[in-house]
Amino acid sequence: MVCGGFACSKNCLCALNLLYTLVSLLLIGIAAWGIGFGLISSLRVVGVVIAVGIFLFLIALVGLIGAVKHHQVLLFFYMIILLLVFIVQFSVSCACLALNQEQQAQLLEVGWNNTASARDDIQRNLNCCGFRSFNPNDTCLASCVKSSHPCSPCAPIIGRYAGEVLRFVGGIGLFFSFTEILGVWLTYRYRNQKDPRANPSAFL
């Protein structure tokens, strides 16, 4: 049977949703690993990562059940949700790739000022204090505070990695965006195909 047939569409859709399931479990595992090893103490960051992982897992589960059972309603809702996720993810990925250095610096400073626990993690892991300058009256968990050498501000250190991280995130986001639009197309095609094992008189 050629790959345009019912069985091939079903297998491709199942494989795609198994990939989404693995990615969702990986996200949840990374968040738990970061908390367990003390790399991340921000519950907000961990909560967002876990929420994204659970959301992706539920989408994959709906798609997998719909594909296995050829369930018209589940496949319809799966297709709509996947299309909405594609639009959001594609927009965010393009924004990550389009940010210039000045916009990156502004975004980093806003994030720095609004996430106290993540700020402590950054200062401890990168061994720096303050964003552009360090106020001795502020609390800093970096080891450089205990040394005789002055602590470096975190902005230049973060800035060196920000561009690479944004390009990486944008690239990964674009890759998954195209897998999502592929999933929408496969779902639409598979949903309108007739199951050869079904009753010929049944309405699809």
From Swiss-Prot:
Protein's membrane topology: Multi-pass membrane protein
Membrane side Extracellular: residue ranges: 41-44, 94-167
Cellular component GO terms, alphabetical: membrane
Modified residues (Phosphoserine): 143
Keywords from the UniProt entry: Glycoprotein, Membrane, Phosphoprotein, Transmembrane, Transmembrane helix
Residue positions the entry lists as glycosylated: 113, 137
Subcellular location: Membrane
Transmembrane portions of the chain: 20-40, 45-65, 73-93, 168-188
Transmembrane helix found in the keyword field: yes
Superkingdom, natural source: Eukaryota
InterPro entries: Tetraspanin/Peripherin, Tetraspanin_animals
Main localization of the protein described in the UniProt heading: membrane
Segments on the Cytoplasmic side according to the record's topology features: 1-19, 66-72, 189-204
Membership in a protein family: Belongs to the tetraspanin (TM4SF) family.
PANTHER family: TETRASPANIN (PTHR19282), TETRASPANIN-13 (PTHR19282:SF203)
Name this polypeptide is given: Tetraspanin-13
Organism of derivation: Bos taurus (Bovine)
